[in-house]
């Protein structure tokens, strides 16, 4: 056993052995991508009873008692939450995405706000200002701005959380029917409990994970749509136990049901379930086929009844949703680091000035020369220096901008409203506007490097359309260009009373051929479509409704229906169709069902005239291998397939074969033997299928369009031009996902596609090179550090969920084997075990990093058959190893985890419910709006925020550092240059509005030019507009401005006389002069930084200056001094100073020296080193005329491809087994005795323990 333990890590470059190292309970099994066998119920029951009985009992620790809520109050069902407090381990059904409630809002919100370094700093500062020995300014200068910051942020957070409450209530208050007091009563979802019996009606969402007990279907079937879970819109069927379906139909029967279910604990495995139902002294095995998961929608079943097994947070979909993460932007983190940097600068400046105070006191202080400054305190010079340090911390505190965060929140709030109000992102057919569900991430939208997109409902409309076909070498169906130009008319199907009115086709020649009846192959072509399928038909209100295992198959049967070959009904052994009005019944001899390995399906029927014929449809790659050598239309069909593939249509080849009676009887014996094989049944059937599917005659091929949402290709094209890489993560089949990749222009024939096997080779080579390098092989160093792939060709990855398990998931040993491990006893054994663990972790991390490096070299990545957890892990890998900004977009509950994991989560509303929208940061109705969200709103938000921050730091440095220079002339006494009210109002009134408007309204180019030139988006991805370099440039700019603002007035005031013979060089006149020069300078500076001028911008700049003068004259008036003499001490300072022309000349000179060098530098930069934005601004009119031509993508041409995987089968396996078992056929309900007779190996005696 020790050998097994060590061998796990011997060769990590190889594919792990899943027999030894399976995935843990919380991980995805390898069976995810393997075909699922829909065997008849009885076959599975017998196998389970014989083989799985013992382990089921051991693993099932979750107990659910029907109709007995008191059962869950037992002590063994309680879990400790805190100290001695306990709560039930069974979760309620209410979901929660909000963060606060009325009790926790204030403490939690304040805690979150004070986690910001600046807020905590100002709280400490406020406390220091209450100490009179060190404070030279009043505490109100800090308290008022701090309360303003905390209050505005709290209101914004409250508004956001109220919106989350509303969304949660919308879900939690949905109605459901629950057995209460012996009868069904209307109950809200949030009041549903584990153990309740509920009724779910047609087209309703399943509110919890429930055990299907019975349904309106006579065969105990229930059809569900799982689009919210796995993104697939084709219907799946669930089957209840026949015993419960028979006995639990009526209300009183359900109310009396007292069964006990023992099953697995809540987990995130969507396709696995193990449990046992104990009822009436018998036990019945349960599997995933009997479970309805929350998020499914009941379709084509009038009603069904179920027992709630898991509720709320315990449901599988919620287990896949992940935790709500607090998201912050890169600029948030950068701002925090810059605030820390300012803290350091502040401490250094205060310490330096405190040292200066110490030396000044020792040489020139009151005890020596300046006796007139004696304050009565006999403090030593060092102690006075210590007090000065804290005094300067208070005086220079505005280096750390207290209003920074509240200003940022106001700007983000305004930008969010602009997104909400954007009519170009409004989807009128569903009355759905764009919605910014958070107000904290807008500028991050301008820095996206990777987009992770769901496929179903996000890129596609989930609509399959029969577009074209080729029959006997002739192609039917017109091109899109002809349709748009109006050259062809839509086919009129009014002659067919059974035609589907929603079906459209544009080629009247085909309908003429059918109705003429001259071409035998055309007749056989559509007869094949009507016969060779596993679709089930039912009539609802006199209307014929089809239920297909895949939307592709449904589209083909619907096409045959409209062309006059209508599938009407089927039984276990027959299928009835209408052939141009004549009803015919064919005997079904065998159905050779589709799976992902066969890539085809066949049906063998006995025709009314007694002949036996095999009809087959499948991918051209497998059909062509099985054709008879004498097939004259092979080349013509091949050319048509190339044309279809060039248009990204999903193709299927159709063929048939006549079988003589003797050959069929011999084959039938082998088929029956394989059907009842106890081991390797699927392999045996495949071999039998291969034997009969030979020497086929080709009829033609079909072409189905998987409709993309509007302008998906154009959106992806523009995003790619913006250097954004797009990864598609879907739960759908590989072939389907690959086809969509071609349709939306992620892939083309110039792209080399790498699959799992190819990637393994690359990764193994890289890891060998790394080992060689570690062992001293210098020759491998260049390979290890180089690129995986050549740069002269485009590459793409297409990988499956099962392959991803090798990269994403931590693998464990089986529990039964883990118990046999030898525990280390000696110190050496412990060190060896630790070394092995560290080695395994390092190798796993190395493999993950190599995979990410390889994937990021590709132009596109498509991950198919992935679970919600795997989607999130893929996103996390790129975040972790590339440090890139990521965006995830999806529309279903299966995308929630991915949406929460990415830096930005976008929900597509109106497709598959609201769960993705509820968990998203932004939502809208169509994928095409993503380009406007990023290239326009995201880019503008990033530019505005960067410009705002650069200017904000600049104006605060310019304001604060004047105190620093003044200290060298006031004995380092911590005296301020300005009056206290100017310090309080500078960031609130005098300089705040212009920069706020720039943060809200500024735009370097228009929205049309932003979309036409996506390369303008790149600076945000590279953090070019705000980084430490820009920060220190703002610091340097502020230092220079502060020097000019202090020393020019200082020099002008030195030894100067006024017109009245009095010296204007008093402290208050100097304070007024420097303050006036500062306000004018910083407001004109924001004017220089403004790219998009409006009346509001101009008014704010001149209005701020006017407000300054108005307030200053009021505060310096004698009247207010009389009312508050201690608060307003600058009486008459402004009127006396500003009536001197000499001081106005000083102010003008100071402003000119501050601004003229900036104007000159800006002019030189735009002339000599213009940016892309500068070039477009300069030639804006010319570029506007070229927008439409440059924005259009080139026509897509795949060229002739010899390889197509885009065949029209998107499902795992059809309904063949179900049809063969007869459970799909309408029949009378079986008697109770007959039901029990079907459970000979399943039912065992069981005595419930009380």
From Swiss-Prot:
What EC number(s) does this enzyme carry?
7.6.2.1
A molecular-function term among this protein's GO annotations: magnesium ion binding
Amino acids binding ATP: 454-456, 553, 594, 617, 650, 730-732, 865, 871, 894-895
What sort of enzyme, by top EC class, is this? Answer: translocase
Tell me the residue ranges located in the Cytoplasmic compartment per UniProt: 1-133, 360-385, 978-980, 1056-1069, 1114-1117, 1162-1250
Output the superkingdom of the source species: Eukaryota
**Membrane spanning segments where?**
134-154, 339-359, 386-406, 957-977, 981-1001, 1035-1055, 1070-1090, 1093-1113, 1118-1138, 1141-1161
Q: Give the UniProt keywords, A-Z.
A: ATP-binding, Cell membrane, Cell projection, Endoplasmic reticulum, Golgi apparatus, Lipid transport, Magnesium, Membrane, Metal-binding, Nucleotide-binding, Phosphoprotein, Translocase, Transmembrane, Transmembrane helix, Transport
The residues exposed to the Exoplasmic loop compartment are 155-338, 407-956, 1002-1034, 1091-1092, 1139-1140
State how it assembles: Component of a P4-ATPase flippase complex which consists of a catalytic alpha subunit and an accessory beta subunit. The flippase ATP8B1:TMEM30A complex can form an intermediate phosphoenzyme in vitro. Also interacts with beta subunit TMEM30B.
User: What is the name of the protein in this document?
Assistant: Phospholipid-transporting ATPase IC
* Originating species: Xenopus tropicalis (Western clawed frog)
The gene from which this protein is expressed is atp8b1
């Amino acid at each position: 056993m020790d050998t097994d333990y060590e061998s796990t890590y011997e060769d990590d470059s190889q594919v792990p052995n899943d027999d030894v190292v399976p995935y843990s309970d919380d991980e995805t099994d390898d069976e995810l991508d393997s075909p699922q066998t829909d065997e008849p119920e009885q076959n599975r029951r017998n196998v389970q009873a014989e083989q799985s009985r013992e382990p089921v009992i051991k693993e099932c620790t979750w107990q659910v008692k029907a109709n007995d809520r008191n059962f869950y109050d037992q002590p063994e069902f309680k879990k400790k939450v805190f100290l001695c407090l306990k709560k039930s381990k069974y979760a309620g059904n209410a979901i929660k995405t909000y963060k606060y409630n009325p009790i926790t809002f204030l403490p939690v919100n304040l805690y979150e706000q004070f986690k910001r370094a600046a807020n905590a700093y100002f709280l400490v500062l406020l406390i220091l200002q209450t100490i009179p020995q060190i404070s030279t300014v009043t505490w109100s200068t800090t308290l008022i701005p701090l309360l303003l910051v905390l209050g505005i942020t709290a209101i914004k957070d409250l508004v956001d959380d109220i919106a989350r409450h509303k969304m949660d209530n919308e879900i939690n208050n949905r109605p459901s029917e629950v057995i209460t007091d012996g009868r069904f009563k209307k109950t809200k979802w949030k009041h549903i409990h584990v153990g309740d019996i509920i009724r779910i009606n047609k087209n309703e969402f399943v509110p919890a994970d429930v055990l299907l007990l019975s349904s309106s279907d006579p065969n105990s079937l229930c059809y569900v749509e799982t689009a919210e879970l796995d993104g697939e819109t084709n219907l799946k069927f669930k089957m209840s136990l026949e015993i419960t379906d028979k006995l639990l139909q009526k209300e009183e029967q359900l109310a009396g049901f007292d069964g006990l279910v023992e099953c697995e604990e809540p987990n995130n495995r969507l396709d696995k379930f193990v449990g046992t139902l104990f009822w009436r002294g018998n036990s019945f095995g349960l599997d995933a086929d009997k479970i309805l998961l929350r998020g499914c929608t009941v379709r084509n079943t009038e009603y069904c009844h179920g027992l709630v097994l898991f509720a709320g947070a315990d449901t599988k979909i919620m287990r896949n949703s992940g935790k709500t993460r607090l998201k912050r932007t890169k600029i948030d983190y950068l701002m925090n680091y810059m605030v820390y940097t300012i803290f350091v600068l502040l401490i250094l400046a205060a310490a330096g000035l405190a040292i200066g105070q110490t030396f000044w006191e020792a040489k020139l202080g009151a005890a020596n020369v300046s006796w007139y400054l004696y304050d009565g305190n006999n403090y030593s010079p060092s102690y006075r220096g210590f007090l000065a340090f804290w005094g300067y911390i208070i005086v220079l505190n505005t280096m750390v901008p207290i209003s920074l965060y509240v200003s940022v929140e106001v700007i983000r709030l305004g930008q969010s409203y602009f997104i909400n109000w954007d009519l170009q992102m409004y989807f009128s057919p569903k009355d759905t506007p764009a919605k910014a569900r958070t107000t904290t991430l807008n500028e991050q939208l301008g820095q996206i490097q990777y987009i992770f997109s769901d496929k179903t409902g996000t890129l596609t409309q989930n609509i399959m359309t029969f577009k074209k076909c080729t029959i006997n070498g002739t192609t039917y169906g017109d091109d899109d260009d002809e349709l748009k130009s109006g050259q062809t008319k839509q086919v009129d199907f009014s002659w067919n009373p059974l035609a589907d009115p929603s079906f459209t086709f544009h080629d009247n020649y085909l309908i003429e051929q059918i109705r003429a009846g001259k071409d035998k192959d055309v007749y056989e072509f559509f007869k094949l479509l009507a016969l060779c399928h596993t679709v089930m038909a039912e009539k609802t209100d006199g209307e014929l409704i089809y239920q297909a295992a895949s939307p592709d198959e449904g589209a083909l049967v619907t096409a045959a229906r409209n062309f006059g070959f209508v599938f009407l009904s089927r039984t276990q052994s027959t299928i009835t169709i209408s052939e141009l009005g004549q009803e015919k019944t064919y005997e079904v001899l065998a159905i050779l069902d589709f799976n992902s390995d066969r890539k085809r399906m066949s049906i063998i029927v006995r025709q009314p005239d007694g002949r036996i014929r095999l009809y087959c449809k499948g991918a051209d790659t497998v059909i062509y291998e099985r054709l008879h050598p004498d097939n004259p239309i092979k080349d013509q069909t091949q050319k048509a397939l190339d044309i279809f593939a060039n248009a990204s249509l999903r193709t299927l080849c159709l063929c048939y074969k006549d079988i003589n009676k003797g050959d069929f009887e011999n084959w039938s014996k082998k088929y029956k033997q394989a059907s009842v094989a106890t081991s390797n049944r699927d392999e045996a059937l495949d071999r039998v299928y291969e034997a009969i599917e030979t020497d086929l005659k080709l009829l033609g091929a079909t072409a189905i369009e998987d409709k993309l949402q509007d302008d998906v290709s154009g959106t992806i094209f523009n995003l790619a031009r913006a250097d954004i890489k797009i990864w598609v993560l879907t739960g759908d089949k590989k072939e389907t996902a690959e086809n969509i990749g071609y349709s939306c222009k992620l892939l083309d024939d110039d792209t080399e596609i790498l699959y799992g096997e190819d990637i393994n080779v690359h990764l193994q080579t890289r890891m060998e090179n790394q080992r060689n390098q570690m062992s001293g092989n210098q020759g491998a160093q260049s390979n290890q550090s180089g690129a995986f792939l050549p740069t002269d060709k485009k590459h793409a990855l297409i990988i499956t969920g099962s392959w991803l398990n090798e990269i994403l998931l931590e693998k464990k040993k089986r529990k039964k084997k883990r118990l046999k491990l030898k525990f280390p006893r000696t110190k050496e054994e412990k060190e060896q075990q630790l070394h092995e663990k560290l080695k395994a972790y390092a190798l796993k991390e190395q493999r993950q990093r190599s995979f990410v490096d390889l994937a990021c070299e590709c132009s596109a990545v498509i991950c198919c058959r992935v679970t919600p957890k795997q989607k999130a892990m893929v996103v996390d890998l790129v975040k972790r190893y590339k440090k890139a900004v990521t965006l995830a977009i999806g529309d279903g509950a299966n995308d929630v985890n991915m949406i929460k994991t990415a830096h930005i989560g976008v929900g597509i509303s109106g497709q598959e419910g609201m769960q993705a929208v509820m968990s998203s940061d932004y939502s809208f109705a169509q994928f095409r709006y993503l380009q406007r969200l990023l290239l326009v709103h995201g880019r503008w938000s990033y530019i505005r925020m960067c410009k705002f921050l650069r200017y904000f730091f600049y104006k605060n440095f310019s304001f604060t550092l004047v105190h620093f220079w003044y200290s060298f002339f006031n004995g380092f006494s911590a005296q301020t240059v300005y009056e206290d009210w100017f310090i309080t109002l500078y960031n609130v009134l005098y300089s705040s509005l212009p920069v706020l408007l720039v943060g809200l309204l500024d735009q370097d180019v228009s929205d049309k030019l932003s979309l036409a030139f996506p390369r303008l988006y790149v600076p945000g991805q590279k953090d070019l507009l705000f980084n430490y370099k820009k920060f220190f440039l703002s610091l340097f700019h502020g230092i220079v401005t502060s020097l000019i603002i202090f020393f020019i007035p200082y020099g002008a005031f030195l030894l100067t006389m006024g017109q009245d013979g009095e010296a204007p060089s008093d402290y208050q006149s100097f304070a007024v002069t420097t303050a006036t020069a500062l306000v004018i300078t910083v407001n004109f500076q924001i004017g220089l930084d403004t790219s998009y001028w409006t009346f509001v911008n101009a008014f704010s700049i001149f209005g701020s200056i006017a407000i300054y003068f108005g307030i200053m004259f009021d505060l310096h008036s004698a009247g207010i001094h009389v009312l508050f003499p201690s608060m307003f001490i600058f009486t008459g300072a402004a009127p006396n100073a500003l009536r001197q022309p000499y001081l106005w000349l000083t102010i003008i000179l100071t402003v000119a020296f501050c601004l003229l060098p900036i104007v000159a530098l800006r002019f030189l930069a735009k002339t000599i080193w213009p940016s892309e934005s500068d070039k477009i601004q300069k030639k804006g009119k010319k570029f506007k005329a070229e927008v439409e031509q440059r924005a259009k993508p080139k026509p897509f041409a795949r060229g002739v491809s010899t390889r197509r995987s885009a065949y029209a089968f998107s499902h795992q396996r059809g309904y063949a087994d179900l049809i063969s078992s007869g459970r799909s056929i309408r029949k009378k309900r079986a008697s109770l005795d007959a039901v029990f007779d079907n459970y000979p190996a399943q039912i065992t005696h069981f005595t419930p323990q009380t």
